[in-house]
Regions:
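A short glycine/serine-rich beta->alpha loop
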Residues: 1-9
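Active-site-flanking alpha-helical
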Residues: 15-16, 217
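Transmembrane helix-loop junctions at the membrane interface of multipass transporters and ion channels
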Residues: 82-83
Length: 319
């Protein structure tokens, strides 16, 4: 056996006795590793008890009833090895929001996959960027799991998921909606990247949220992969992460964020058109992403200048 999981209160009892008896009877260690967890604590700082009052703290069973089994697993998985964790509604709410966003983002991506046959295409820059982000996350995820750091692994997946939703989907969605404007190849590139990363995310999240990931997987991906369950499928390994384009893609996201921030600060709708934006000191990657930047920010003209990095909005389209 490779692993013995238990809490820190069992180190000098269960762990010691098992090791001693195994050496005595079999002259070998019973397992290679021990995974030490902490306790779930009530609001008073005491270990949760089945028989004693927990001071009104939400119990795991109540959490299951209120938030679902997936959210309860999410909360439990967030704990660091060997450390106690307070049971707070805030953490369960975070898990519930993640589950809702996962469902909605999946519905969006899957809505563009009807009749779609997955195939590798020459990716547009931001599509290649999100694939590289996935490769980086996958590498960090597997490294954390090898150390039994379930919480760190989950944190890596969450960062990618919110990047995927808040940045990538927002930037690429116009190419999915309007192939007649941006071209079929631009749509196919976005289809490949969005569906591939979503599938990878579902698989990485499946050990934390097994029910909702299975539900989404069965909708489309089970047929594509010819697999009965996400839990019998393999993780999606897209190859070695090289890291050459992640910083450039992040630069695009930062520019989009600045322009959207300008609109918000000036009480403008995100759909409000801009006559011209001047981007100074950007990379060639940003220039190659002009089609996406114009689309997501509704810009008529982008001018590029040399010099210190800066983004300047020169005019707003009159309504």
């Amino acid at each position: 056996m490779d692993l013995r999981p238990n809490a820190h209160d069992n180190i000098r009892v269960w762990d010691f006795y098992t090791i001693a008896k195994s050496l005595l009877h079999f002259n070998k260690l019973p397992w290679r590793d021990v995974m030490i967890s902490g306790w779930g604590l009530s609001a008073t700082g005491n270990k949760l008890s089945k028989s004693k009052s927990n001071g009104g703290t939400l119990t795991p069973h109540q959490a299951y009833e209120k938030y679902s089994a997936d959210v309860t697993r999410y909360w439990a998985s967030n704990a660091s090895l060997g450390k106690d964790v307070y049971i707070k509604d805030e953490e369960f709410n975070n898990g519930f929001k993640l589950m809702q966003k996962l469902w909605n983002a999946s519905r969006f991506v899957l809505s563009f996959l009807e009749g779609y046959t997955p195939k590798e295409v020459e990716l547009l820059p931001m599509d290649a960027w999100i694939i590289s982000c996935y490769k980086q996350t996958y590498s960090r995820f597997m490294s954390a799991l090898e150390k039994y750091e379930m919480g760190l692994a989950l944190n890596e997946v969450e960062k990618l998921f919110w990047n995927f939703c808040d940045n990538y989907i927002e930037i690429a969605k116009n190419r999915l909606y309007k192939p007649e404007v941006y071209g079929e190849h631009a749509k196919e590139s976005a289809q490949y990247a969005s569906s591939t990363v979503l599938l990878g995310l579902l698989k990485l999240l499946s050990i934390y949220m097994p029910h909702i990931t299975e539900e989404i997987y069965q909708d489309t991906f089970a047929k594509i992969e010819d697999c009965t369950s996400i839990h019998t499928s393999k993780y999606l390994d897209l190859g070695e992460y090289t890291g050459h384009d992640i910083a450039f893609g992040n630069e695009v996201c930062e520019i989009v964020s600045i322009i959207r921030g300008y609109k918000s600060q000036n009480n403008l709708s995100l759909k409000t058109g801009l006559t011209e934006v001047v981007i100074t000191g950007c990379s060639q990657f940003v220039k190659d992403c002009e089609i996406d930047i114009k689309a997501v920010c509704n810009i008529q003209k982008i001018t590029y200048l040399e010099g210190e990095k800066n983004v300047e909005i020169l005019g707003v389209v009159a309504e």
